[in-house]
Amino acid sequence: MSAKEVKFGVDARDRMLRGVDILANAVKVTLGPKGRNVVLDKSFGAPRITKDGVTVAKDIELDDKFENMGAQMVREVASKSADAAGDGTTTATVLAQAIVREGAKAVAAGMNPMDLKRGIDLAVEAVVADLVKNSKKVTSNDEIAQVGTISANGDAEIGKFLADAMKKVGNEGVITVEEAKSLETELDVVEGMQFDRGYISPYFVTNADKMRVEFDDAYILINEKKLSNLNELLPLLEAVVQTGKPLVIVAEDVEGEALATLVVNRLRGGLKVAAVKAPGFGDRRKAMLQDIAILTGGQAISEDLGIKMENVTLQMLGRAKKVMIDKENTTIVNGAGKKADIEARVAQIKAQIEETTSDYDREKLQERLAKLAGGVAVIRVGGATEVEVKERKDRVDDAMHATRAAVEEGIVPGGGVALLRASEQLKGLKTKNDDQKTGVEIVRRALSAPARQIAINAGEDGSVIVGKVLEKEQYAFGFDSQSGEYGDLVKKGIIDPTKVVRTAIQNAASVAALLITTEAMIAELPKKGGAGAGGMPPGGGMGGMDF
């Protein structure tokens, strides 16, 4: 085990504070509509330009181990806010820095760190209660667009795209963000259920121009196993032919004489039929087939349930108004499933999302939920250069999470005003002793930091702006740093999701309180130079190659 260096008390906190300041100062320049960009060097490819706080925070690694510990703790604030609300990472970092700075002063003045922490916790509870009380539900499409615009740093086009996407796929739908191949940003919405499996044979194609199968009012056979034996299928095929309706077969695979017969009948006999492979693998495949069955009002044919293929009747098949199958995807629109059954399945998947600890599983469950409950919208972000597209994509990601958060918990005035108003509620807060009162005061002073920083980034005097905003009683009154005017921020469309502001203060206070109560820090001693260099002479490994 290598030797360790230990720092105590003021020395430890000073080093840690330096790290906190370095990270927070790099992140906070991005705050607000007039925030600046940060350029990140990449070991390969072009540098990355971003205005996303958490992306900047994740890129910072300091040489000094003790400073780095402070920086990493504040990075955790940004990451946690990004995970919980998807936005508000810069606000959380600015708040954490303000609380740590004020707290360190109080500890240096001889106050009890544990009582300070209790005071901070009390204050945060009161702030959260005030935010929830003043939160306003999002009702219109315009409000969703405003939230998206603010989060995308005033880009109204992004706000509009997100509002359209939310309108089309609903709150449960999935919105994905991709890089476009052109200059234009575009929105592509897939309604109904789509899965990434295409037709097994191109001979099933009905629309030769688009090379896809298009069926209206189709029956859907959902089978877990491979279909290779024709005799199993015959009774069902005969029943479907009599109805005159098309049949889509979703199975693990269709091969051998079963596939050959389907193709021949499709080409010669005019049997409207198409076969696709089942989506997913293993247990996930079973679940997805069950989803398709519930959506279409059919039954997933499985030998586990004791249903044999030759005994399948028309009543066991699913129905859909429209089915489209191309080389890579199958889309089922307007399935005939009962609304109550679909809602029960949605509730079940939501419960699984709550319980799962795996990010991968959560993502897959959310995809399944979207396919059942809403649809999938893809925003393709365009730009002139790769660097611009990546920067814009970061902003679209932020805005997408912010709009989701706004729909979940409502909105409050933006521009740091909601936190400023909450700070006024802390003046009369009851505490058990003076040190706890100081803890409350630390949070009260820190709550003005985001509004100050937004003003500073816009070239204004932060203290003057904060003073003027607090003079007015009106809750939504604040400073619009984009236009340089005061007014009702909600009417101006400057709004923040309550969830984003709430998670920012909770995460900032949580980590900051831990930093304040730190008394010792332990890190590995830096390695002595030369020992691990392998004895190579200076000037490169090969003689005579010094150009």
Curated annotation (Swiss-Prot):
Q: Which InterPro entries match?
A: Chaperonin_Cpn60_CS, Cpn60/GroEL, Cpn60/GroEL/TCP-1, GroEL-like_apical_dom_sf, GROEL-like_equatorial_sf, TCP-1-like_intermed_sf
Protein EC: 5.6.1.7
- Which transformation does this protein catalyse, written as a reaction? ATP + H2O + a folded polypeptide = ADP + phosphate + an unfolded polypeptide
Q: Which GO terms describe its biological process?
A: protein refolding
Instruction: Give GO terms: molecular function aspect only.
Output: ATP binding; ATP-dependent protein folding chaperone; isomerase activity; unfolded protein binding
Q: Which GO terms describe its cellular component?
A: cytoplasm
Q: Which residues bind ATP?
A: 30-33, 51, 87-91, 415, 496
Keywords annotated in UniProt: ATP-binding, Chaperone, Cytoplasm, Isomerase, Nucleotide-binding
Its domain of life reads: Bacteria
Coarse class of the protein's main subcellular location: cytoplasm
Where in or outside the cell it occurs: the entry states:
Cytoplasm
Q: Name one Pfam family in it.
A: Cpn60_TCP1
State how it assembles.
Answer: Forms a cylinder of 14 subunits composed of two heptameric rings stacked back-to-back. Interacts with the co-chaperonin GroES.
UniProt lists the family membership as follows:
Belongs to the chaperonin (HSP60) family.
PANTHER family assigned to the protein according to its UniProt record, in alphabetical order: 60 KDA HEAT SHOCK PROTEIN, MITOCHONDRIAL
Which NCBIfam families does the record cross-reference, listed alphabetically?
A: GroEL, PRK00013.1, PRK12849.1, PRK12850.1, PRK12851.1, PRK14104.1
Q: What does this protein do?
A: Together with its co-chaperonin GroES, plays an essential role in assisting protein folding. The GroEL-GroES system forms a nano-cage that allows encapsulation of the non-native substrate proteins and provides a physical environment optimized to promote and accelerate protein folding.
Official protein name in the record: Chaperonin GroEL 2
